[in-house]
């Protein structure tokens, strides 16, 4: 079997299928060909890995994988993260979720000669990326809120031109015009939407 340079001359490889509360591990001895499936609870996961001694770990790239990769690399392990779409190609049964098969697919994908791994970010790099993601989410939420306000006010004949600039320029006037709405509950709801809009603007800064 042809394997990539990362997996060559490595005696032990651990493929880990992560979940919220438990971890499925496939421990493979490359010299003997022996494979062992182990499932451990989250609280015992780190200790179980450390007991194996420094080796090669394959993990599917997910929300927590960057953290695990940095942690185990700090203990002398080599960690390689694999994009989920690449692993999926090696699943024997894609319709039925099975942790052991998932771990097997991670291992099989990890040793392929053409597998491209996901770069492990430093904590600082990950923080910057997350802040960027949060800012994008705030922009999306702000646009959604402004469209909602526009839609509600249009029901009462209050119209503003499209675009953030136009909305921001007219926002005070729009708010004052919304005061013309007689229903107190609806008026309060619109007021809260304006407040939410301003909060989203602050989050974008």
Segments (PLM) and residue ranges:
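Intrinsically disordered, low-complexity and often Lys/Arg-enriched segments
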Residues: 1-11, 43, 53, 78
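Extended, highly charged alpha-helical segments
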Residues: 105-149
